[in-house]
Amino acid sequence: EERLRGLLDIPVLHDDQHGTAVVVAAALMNACEVAGKQPEDIAITICGAGSAAVSTARMLNSMGIDKKHIVMVDSKGVINTQRTDLNSIKSEFATERRIGTLQEAMNGADAFIGLSRGNLLEEKEIMAMKERPVIFALANPTPEISYSRAKSIRPDAIVATGRSDAPNQ
């Protein structure tokens, strides 16, 4: 993408990155309205640190959600300032909080945005979230947690997946 931007004099849209970011941002704004939460005040855990996750975090930041309210988790744990293995892109979203695990990142989170791998969210992590949590389990083809499982654990949750067979795609 960066190379194309340097070569071309037209806008470049990377669908997997920017398309995902736009849809997630719009859905999150709507979910906040339904849940009675102010977007700029919510704590967000983003699971995944690939291009879609980074673009989503950047989009949310551009919409007024401070980076300090976003905790990003990759396959090695929370992306924080204590880690020495971060590239410049991951460093952009490194939290200063001294937490290391997904479980710790989910403690008190208002929203979970999953852009990682399937079946990684457990009941304890969902239960650690605030009232009326927003859970976007978007890994495909298998979400981080299924719609039905998330709703059975937290009936108060606003849940979306990328699955067309789920009621809230």
Residue ranges and their predicted role:
Residues 12-15, 46, 72, 113-114, ...:
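General beta-strand structural signal in soluble alpha/beta enzymes
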Residues 17-18, 84, 98, 126, ...:
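Short capping/connector residues at structural and topological boundaries
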Residues 9-10, 87-93, 156-157:
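Active-site regions of enzymes building and remodeling cell-envelope glycoconjugates
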